[in-house]
Amino acid sequence: MGQLSSANNLFALELFHTLNESNPTGNTIFSPVSISSALAMVYLGARGSTAAQLSKTLHFDSAEDIHSQFQSLTAEVSKRGASHTLKLANRLYGEKTYNFLPEYLASIQKTYSADLALVDFQHASEDARKEINQWVKGQTEEKIQELFAVGVVDSMTKLVLVNATYFKGMWQKKFMARDTTDAPFRLSKKVTKTVKMMYLKNNLPFGYIPDLKCKVLEMPYQGGELSMVILLPEDIEDETTGLEEIEKQLTLEKLQECENLQNIDVCVKLPKFKMEESYILNSNLGQLGVQDLFSSSKADLSGMSGSRDLFISKIVHKSYVEVNEEGTETDAAMPGTVVGCCLMPMEFTVDHPFLFFIRHNPTAHVLFLGRVCSP
């Protein structure tokens, strides 16, 4: 795992914990790489303690040449000709009365293929909101219809960071629609719901992490560059979703263990699901140490505008994920510790809450990280 992927994946887990704390029994889906990339773009224009807080929270201090590494990563995961579609769409929207430095605008365009759009928050914030939503809609093939709800921006807004991700991948081995049936899914020890359960028998990377008491299954996408990795607890052992212990103990090392799976015959039962989650990340990032960025008196974004009176009003991220028989649409290693298995086909029945991530295998980056409590 390279410096940047370690930094990004560690940040992904820390952000995942804060998102789950604020919504302990709900679904979660976000794109950590997309958020890291967007914040790196802000970091490029940050100075002083604002830059130091971003660097520490994003673990940039452990990696060199951050911006050129992000440039390479973006090119790698979004390259044309791949059998999947992945678009990281980041854009800053700034109040038009501010002067933004031409060299900063040129840098974010060159390094992050991003730009800064000037809008009239001061006199026409509702028009600005609609313009932002229209742009996001276009970037995500209309999957994300309304990133900014009414009231998210107003006449006091100075600068917002918009972050949208669109991904579409097809399974290497598709589920057959005729095998999909109604089946129970346990939301907790006492509550169940009926879901559309897909079925597939195939030879797939599988393992077991004893510390977490969970099975791990890797489902490759066409081309092999991306995989969905599912972490399924043996059972619901707590009084909520059954995920409490896994979430507490999920570390960078445990993520790396998920790279050491063994191919075996598996009977997979996986629910079809569709999720859409939106986050204003200010408070979550504040919990992780990014505070000055959102303060009108403390923020130092003088590398963006040349002045000290600019700060970020909102950082908004929205992800959409749909898993079906064909594949996924989203918007948004320690040898020996994963135990392989047996000669009979392994049953992998996803009939209770689980975690998943979508990994870019060549770089080991976690592109999406999610929790499904109710498919």
Curated annotation (Swiss-Prot):
GO cellular component labels: cytoplasm; extracellular space
Tissue expression profile of the protein: Expressed in heart.
The keyword Cytoplasm is assigned to this record: yes
Record SUPFAM superfamilies: Serpins (SSF56574)
SMART domains on file: SERPIN
Marked site positions, Reactive bond: 343-344
Domain of life (superkingdom): Eukaryota
GO process terms (BP): negative regulation of interleukin-1 beta production
Keywords, comma-separated and alphabetical: Cytoplasm, Protease inhibitor, Serine protease inhibitor
UniProt-annotated location(s): Cytoplasm
InterPro entries in the record: Serpin_CS (IPR023795), Serpin_dom (IPR023796), Serpin_fam (IPR000215), Serpin_sf (IPR036186), Serpin_sf_1 (IPR042178), Serpin_sf_2 (IPR042185)
Major localization listed first in the record, in broad terms: cytoplasm
Subunit structure: Monomer. Interacts (via C-terminus) with CASP1 and CASP4 (via CARD domain); these interactions regulate the activity of inflammatory caspases.
Function, in words: Regulates the activity of the neutrophil proteases. Forms only a stable complex with CTSG/Cathepsin G. During inflammation, limits the activity of inflammatory caspases CASP1 and CASP4 by suppressing their caspase-recruitment domain (CARD) oligomerization and enzymatic activation.
Protein name: Leukocyte elastase inhibitor C
Lineage: Eukaryota, Metazoa, Chordata, Craniata, Vertebrata
